[in-house]
Amino acid sequence: MQLNPAEISELIKSRIEGLTAGANIRNQGTVVSVTDGIVRIHGLSDVMQGEMLEFPADAEGQPSYGLALNLERDSVGAVILGAYEHISEGNTVKCTGRILEVPVGPELKGRVVNALGQPIDGKGPIDAKMTDVIEKVAPGVIARQSVSQPMQTGLKSIDSMVPVGRGQRELIIGDRQTGKTAVAIDAIINQKGQNMTCVYVAIGQKASSVKNVVRSLEQAGAMEYTIVVAATASESAAMQYVAAYSGCTMGEYFRDRGEDALIVYDDLSKQAVAYRQVSLLLRRPPGREAYPGDVFYLHSRLLERAARVNEKYVEDFTKGAVKGKTGSLTALPIIETQAGDVSAFVPTNVISITDGQIFLETSLFNAGIRPAINAGISVSRVGGAAQTKLIKNLSGGIRTDLAQYRELAAFAQFASDLDEATRKQLERGARVTELLKQAQYSPLPISLMGATLFAVNKGYLDDIAVNKLLSFEHGLHGYLKDKHAALLAKLEADKAMDKDAEAELNAATAAFKKSFA
């Protein structure tokens, strides 16, 4: 049999002309069951862990997305992000080939978004130029730089006793209604003018509470540099679980470009509960307190992303666009304890991951000592290196004074006659405790904080009644702002006190004390 070359070319031409190129065939599957926001899907063979899955659109035509979490032999377990009432057995599910992403960038500042980065504040769409994946590997050891710059919270008790540095993870832990959120909000308000972008992640809170926080930030002028990510109690467990990672990615955008960012997770106890719910519905085996086995990894992979990265990392990331700058992401995770039990599963996990903790106690809060910080067991493991010279030199003995005062106060209840040294220690402790009280939404600059600590150390307050100390402090601050503005500006700029500044502050405090009645 002979082949004619002309026939072969004709055959090839006809084949090419008759070819119909359709759309790319995407991996598709079928919904087997839908229960409590968990969907079992059959037929997805090429799906990735954490991949976004596309479900049928809802009644308004909005596409629904889910997250593939369980990859089993003959089915895939996925959680629906958002409403799932319109999804039924037999629906078609498509792979997107993308890991879950959220919008990032400066366009998000001043806005309130949900866990997927969609605006929920009624101010119109967000014109974000970029998106980024929510799950990322934390910077390695070589990419990091040690914490050496302060992150001022504006709270006397924290900045003097448990200082926080840029790139640190400092846990705020305490029972309900002890002022945990108030401490974090004050820290955000104090970042005004400090070139710090703040991200506030509200997990499992009442919508009214989130609204109050946003209102407080707006009144303080802090919303212009803050992004609020809200997954309220009315939203699905999947959204509450995802929200923290979304917020972290938004904060990392600034860290990786040589800027500083602060992120508050309020609170991680509720995130762990949401993750437990999702895991149990996916039929993963429960462990201690019914949490899944990877609940430690849930928080460690999140909090390890808060770091201070070195100049080379920033330069490599921006491909040379930003040179000679380090970036940082500081985390203030919040954990709620039950009746002060810090030995529960989630609190111990987060304490072991973070670089220190601020303990807030109900008894102190009820006694009117606010912020209700327990000085004895609150620590900052790396913040000491970041503390400003001014505060470091002036606050040396305060922590010891307070710890000894609490110990002695317990004994003094039983002793009728006390020796002179003990009495003096008790009086000093009472004065220091009174002076560390601070009203909410009124963080102090370091110059005024330094003036207060200076007055304590030099004994100017020893003969003033304890109940008049806060009015003395308020008056002193007003006097210094009025008559010694240059001195305050110098202290603020230098962040240290030389001999001349000390002499001027000494004279100013003495002069004010004479006029104080």
Swiss-Prot record:
The keyword Ion transport applies. It is found in: Cell inner membrane. GO terms for cellular component: plasma membrane; proton-transporting ATP synthase complex. CDD domains: ATP-synt_F1_alpha_C, ATP-synt_F1_alpha_N, F1-ATPase_alpha_CD. It is an enzyme of class 7 (translocase). It catalyses: ATP + H2O + 4 H(+)(in) = ADP + phosphate + 5 H(+)(out). Its EC number is 7.1.2.2. GO terms for molecular function: ADP binding; ATP binding; proton-transporting ATP synthase activity, rotational mechanism. The keyword RNA-binding does not apply. It comes from the Bacteria. It is a peripheral membrane protein. InterPro entries: ATP_synth_asu-like_sf, ATP_synth_asu_C, ATP_synth_asu_C_sf, ATP_synth_F1_a_nt-bd_dom, ATP_synth_F1_asu, ATPase_a/bsu_AS, ATPase_F1/V1/A1_a/bsu_N, ATPase_F1/V1/A1_a/bsu_N_sf. Keywords: ATP synthesis, ATP-binding, Cell inner membrane, Cell membrane, CF(1), Hydrogen ion transport, Ion transport, Membrane, Nucleotide-binding, Translocase, Transport. ATP binds at G174, D175, R176, Q177, T178, G179, K180, T181. The record marks S378 as: Required for activity. Gene3D superfamilies: 2.40.30.20, ATP synthase alpha/beta chain, C-terminal domain, P-loop containing nucleotide triphosphate hydrolases. Its main location: membrane. It holds the Pfam family ATP-synt_ab. Produces ATP from ADP in the presence of a proton gradient across the membrane. The alpha chain is a regulatory subunit. F-type ATPases have 2 components, CF(1) - the catalytic core - and CF(0) - the membrane proton channel. CF(1) has five subunits: alpha(3), beta(3), gamma(1), delta(1), epsilon(1). CF(0) has three main subunits: a(1), b(2) and c(9-12). The alpha and beta chains form an alternating ring which encloses part of the gamma chain. CF(1) is attached to CF(0) by a central stalk formed by the gamma and epsilon chains, while a peripheral stalk is formed by the delta and b chains. Belongs to the ATPase alpha/beta chains family. This is ATP synthase subunit alpha 1. It comes from Albidiferax ferrireducens (strain ATCC BAA-621 / DSM 15236 / T118). The lineage of its organism: Bacteria, Pseudomonadati, Pseudomonadota, Betaproteobacteria, Burkholderiales.
